[in-house]
Amino acid sequence: MRARLALAVSGVDYELREVSLKSKPDELLAASPKGTVPVLVLPGGQVIDESLDIMHWALAQNDPDGWLKHPLDEMLALIAGNDGQFKQALDRYKYPNRYTLESDGDTQAFALAQRLKAENWLAKLEPRLSLGWLFGNQPSLADMATLPFVRQFAHTDAAWFAAQPWPQLRAWLTYFEASALFESVMAKHKSWQSMI
């Protein structure tokens, strides 16, 4: 989602191909053998297959909302924490059955322990959001790179999330989910079919 956010806000023309990861098209695997999404194939054939790299590329083309105007090293440090400790805990909290070797068979206790790790990360974000966004009063690369993962976390147990002492975090997420940008990237698309 975060790659789509940056592509959309940049206004760069691109062709979206929604693919089923259960039946990966040969074209996807030819472009990026690791077979994950997103993948951006540029007109010259260069392939960018990491979402954060796609965000950087799109915003380097056009950054009309100033997502890159804040100190890049500070934003990247925050994103690294999100993509590292928080994302690891999120995956294990949301899908504990995928980590049975790590859970010693008690997936429920394992999921709750992972939720606690994720909570610690989110608690650090709460005071940063006093002006509405992570780096002040306007969205930044850091906001748009982290919000999709915070959204996944919140929707894993929405009632529990709503009861947490994070009013600024919830307001941030609610504003994002109500935005036209979010709606535009969440539009459903048919799976692309190869012509071969």
Across the structure, where does each feature detected by a protein language model lie?
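GST-like fold's C-terminal all-alpha helical module
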Residues: 74, 78-175
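Residues that scaffold the ATP/ADP-binding catalytic core of kinase and kinase-like folds
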Residues: 57, 156, 185
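Long hydrophobic alpha-helical segments typical of transmembrane helices together
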Residues: 167-196
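GST-like domain detector, emphasizing the conserved glutathione-binding G-site
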Residues: 1-112, 119
